[in-house]
Structure formats: structure tokens, C-alpha cells
């Protein structure tokens, strides 16, 4: 039985890879793509979601735009990583085949969760958590109906938006605090894991060998991404967001530890930090777990297989 997910994202180059993976893997039933301000403005990330849906040949999956700004803070973006469009240097068609759902993303999330059987939908946020927090506040009953939240965000060893805070949590820590403190199960796929998901030359060669238009698109954005990382960070591109989707497909793609997690909201130097408590004894009723180690080969095999299954959509 395919796992039903709602992918709440801010495309974003690595979000695009996550969309390809979710669409191309038969173990996933992609119920919706919802967008939130993050890597770029809401307008730009929504445009990018429609572009990627067109490239991947996604039909019949609603795409809806969500929150334009965090719950209480100002807007920050990551144009220095993803470019001014949020999707590197790709070109855009005069119009998109993929039409926007008329509902706000938060309402679409609520509608889908409330209309499906309880514990059948996994939320996969790969951007800031504003939409998810808003959905919880508008319709608290969704918490008991969601199977799990598997998010890309946070980190227990290092940050990227600050020395200790990861970007997705940093841009809306109040939303993250809401999501992590609800009574649902949360798997945090953070920087400690995603920094292992490198788009190495060997990986890019495998993408090129797929030989389809979606593969060429992915190669183009990964090339842009890698050049930015090589210049700014002296490393290969770190493909964060598809790691969360990969976990839903096959949890053995990474190892996790069940530990308490909370969000720092008031620190002079630590706002947005995901505070992970590895001390023993561990709480028996702990609802949060953090990803630790990635099976690199298994992860990239999932991505390449999804690309091959997508083929060349008409």
C-alpha cells in the first residue's frame, strides 16, 4: 500500500529533487504539493513548484500556495544558495500546465487530513513550518489524524543560518515550536543527516546517464547548486530535502535515535536552535526522533530509480 504524503515545500533546488522522488517512487502516493515562503518568496517558490510538476509530468495532484511570511518574524530567504528565482538558472515557459488549487495551502492540508482515514497521511515539510503550524491552530483535530510528521529541518551539531540554527527552523522558530510540541510523532531529518547527501560528480554522472528531460533538468539545477556550494562552502551540493521523502519510502535508508527535541525561541545567540537531549535515561513516551546516519548508496539509488520511472512525460 503506497504511503500517502503531503509535501509542504519551498522550491528550492533540493525541494525539486524531493518532488521528483515523491512522484517517481511507487511506494508514495503524493496527495498534494503545498508551498510556503522560505528559499524564496511565496510567489517564486509556487512558480517553481508548478515548473517542477510540469517537468515531472505530475497530473491530478493539487498544488496550492500557502503562507507569505512567518508567524511573527520578518521574511528571510536563501537566494544566495538557490538563486534569484529559487531554481538556479533554469528558464520558464510562457505558462504552466499545472494550475493552482483555489484553496490556501493550509486549508488544503486540513481538508485532505480530515477527509482521509485517520493515521493514513504523513506530512513531509521541507521548508519552514509556517503552513503546518497554521493548520494545527486552525484545526487542532488534525494532530490525532496524522500518521507522522517527517520534516527536513534542524540539526543537533551545527547550523547553517547561524552557528546553531538550521534555516527552515530559523526562519520561523515559533512555527517549529508548535510542530515539535504537539502530540504527534515527529522525525527530524536535520543537517547532521542531510550533509551526508552529497551530489558528488559520480552522482551527477548517474543522473546524466538516465538520459531524459527530467534528468537533464535535475542535472542543470544540481550543477548550479554544486557550484554555489563549492564556492561558498568548499564542498559538493548537499541535497537536503529528498532525504525526508526517502525516509518515508524506506526508513532503513537512515538510522535514527528517539530523543527529546525542543526549539529555542529567546536566545541572544541561539534563536531557532533545535535543542536535542541525548542524555540517558531517555523518556519512554518520547514522540520525537532525529536522523543520524545516511545510507548514501541506498539514498541515491532511490532518487535515480524515481527519475528512471518518471521517464520522459508527454
UniProtKB/Swiss-Prot annotation:
<dbReference type="InterPro" id="IPR015910">
    <property type="entry name" value="I/U_nuclsd_hydro_CS"/>
</dbReference>
<dbReference type="Pfam" id="PF01156">
    <property type="entry name" value="IU_nuc_hydro"/>
</dbReference>
<comment type="similarity">
    <text>Belongs to the IUNH family.</text>
</comment>
<feature type="binding site">
    <location>
        <position position="160"/>
    </location>
    <ligand>
        <name>substrate</name>
    </ligand>
</feature>
<dbReference type="InterPro" id="IPR023186">
    <property type="entry name" value="IUNH"/>
</dbReference>
<dbReference type="GO" id="GO:0005509">
    <property type="term" value="F:calcium ion binding"/>
</dbReference>
<dbReference type="GO" id="GO:0043101">
    <property type="term" value="P:purine-containing compound salvage"/>
</dbReference>
<keyword id="KW-0378">Hydrolase</keyword>
<feature type="binding site">
    <location>
        <position position="10"/>
    </location>
    <ligand>
        <name>Ca(2+)</name>
    </ligand>
</feature>
<feature type="binding site">
    <location>
        <position position="168"/>
    </location>
    <ligand>
        <name>substrate</name>
    </ligand>
</feature>
<keyword id="KW-0546">Nucleotide metabolism</keyword>
<comment type="subunit">
    <text>Homotetramer.</text>
</comment>
<protein>
    <recommendedName>
        <fullName>Inosine-uridine preferring nucleoside hydrolase</fullName>
        <ecNumber>3.2.2.2</ecNumber>
        <ecNumber>3.2.2.3</ecNumber>
    </recommendedName>
</protein>
<dbReference type="GO" id="GO:0008477">
    <property type="term" value="F:purine nucleosidase activity"/>
</dbReference>
<feature type="binding site">
    <location>
        <position position="166"/>
    </location>
    <ligand>
        <name>substrate</name>
    </ligand>
</feature>
<keyword id="KW-0326">Glycosidase</keyword>
<dbReference type="InterPro" id="IPR036452">
    <property type="entry name" value="Ribo_hydro-like"/>
</dbReference>
<feature type="active site" description="Proton donor">
    <location>
        <position position="240"/>
    </location>
</feature>
<comment type="function">
    <text>Catalyzes the hydrolysis of the N-glycosidic bond of all of the commonly occurring purine and pyrimidine nucleosides into ribose and the associated base, but has a preference for inosine and uridine as substrates. Likely functions in purine salvage from the host, a fundamental pathway since protozoan parasites such as L.major are incapable of de novo purine biosynthesis.</text>
</comment>
<feature type="binding site">
    <location>
        <position position="15"/>
    </location>
    <ligand>
        <name>Ca(2+)</name>
    </ligand>
</feature>
<keyword id="KW-0106">Calcium</keyword>
<feature type="binding site">
    <location>
        <position position="14"/>
    </location>
    <ligand>
        <name>substrate</name>
    </ligand>
</feature>
<dbReference type="GO" id="GO:0009117">
    <property type="term" value="P:nucleotide metabolic process"/>
</dbReference>
<dbReference type="InterPro" id="IPR001910">
    <property type="entry name" value="Inosine/uridine_hydrolase_dom"/>
</dbReference>
<keyword id="KW-0479">Metal-binding</keyword>
<dbReference type="GO" id="GO:0045437">
    <property type="term" value="F:uridine nucleosidase activity"/>
</dbReference>
<feature type="binding site">
    <location>
        <position position="241"/>
    </location>
    <ligand>
        <name>Ca(2+)</name>
    </ligand>
</feature>
<dbReference type="GO" id="GO:0047724">
    <property type="term" value="F:inosine nucleosidase activity"/>
</dbReference>
<comment type="pathway">
    <text>Purine metabolism; purine nucleoside salvage.</text>
</comment>
<feature type="binding site">
    <location>
        <position position="126"/>
    </location>
    <ligand>
        <name>Ca(2+)</name>
    </ligand>
</feature>
Amino acid at each position: 500500500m503506497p504511503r500517502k504524503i503531503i509535501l509542504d515545500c519551498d522550491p528550492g533546488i533540493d525541494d525539486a529533487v524531493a518532488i521528483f522522488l515523491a512522484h517517481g517512487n511507487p511506494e508514495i502516493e503524493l496527495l498534494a504539493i503545498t508551498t510556503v515562503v522560505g528559499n524564496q518568496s511565496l510567489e517564486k517558490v509556487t512558480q517553481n513548484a508548478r515548473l517542477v510538476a510540469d517537468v515531472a509530468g505530475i497530473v491530478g495532484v493539487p498544488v496550492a500556495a500557502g503562507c507569505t511570511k512567518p508567524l511573527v518574524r520578518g521574511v528571510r530567504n536563501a537566494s544566495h544558495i538557490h538563486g534569484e528565482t529559487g531554481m538556479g538558472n533554469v528558464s520558464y515557459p510562457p505558462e504552466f500546465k499545472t494550475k493552482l488549487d483555489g484553496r490556501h495551502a493550509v486549508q488544503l492540508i486540513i481538508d485532505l487530513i480530515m477527509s482521509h482515514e485517520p493515521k493514513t497521511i504523513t506530512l513531509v515539510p521541507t521548508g519552514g513550518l509556517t503552513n503546518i503550524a497554521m493548520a494545527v491552530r486552525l484545526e487542532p483535530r488534525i494532530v490525532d489524524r496524522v500518521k507522522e510528521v517527517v520534516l527536513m529541518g534542524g540539526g543537533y551539531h551545527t547550523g547553517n543560518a547561524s552557528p546553531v540554527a538550521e534555516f527552515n527552523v530559523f526562519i520561523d522558530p515559533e512555527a517549529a515550536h508548535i510542530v515539535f510540541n504537539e502530540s504527534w510523532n515527529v522525525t527530524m531529518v536535520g543537517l547532521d543527516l542531510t550533509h551526508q547527501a552529497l551530489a558528488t560528480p559520480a552522482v551527477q554522472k548517474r543522473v546524466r546517464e538516465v538520459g531524459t528531460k527530467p534528468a537533464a533538468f535535475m542535472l542543470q539545477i544540481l550543477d548550479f547548486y554544486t557550484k554555489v556550494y563549492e564556492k561558498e562552502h568548499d564542498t559538493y551540493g548537499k541535497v537536503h530535502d529528498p532525504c525526508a521523502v526517502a525516509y518515508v519510502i524506506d526508513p532503513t535508508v537512515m538510522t535514527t535515535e528517539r530523543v527529546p527535541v525542543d526549539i529555542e525561541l529567546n536566545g541572544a545567540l541561539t534563536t531557532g536552535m533545535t535543542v536535542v537531549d541525548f542524555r540517558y535515561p531517555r523518556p519512554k513516551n518520547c514522540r520525537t526522533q532525529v536522523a543520524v546516519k545516511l545510507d548514501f548508496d541506498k539514498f541515491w539509488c532511490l532518487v535515480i530509480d524515481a527519475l528512471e520511472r518518471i521517464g520522459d512525460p508527454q
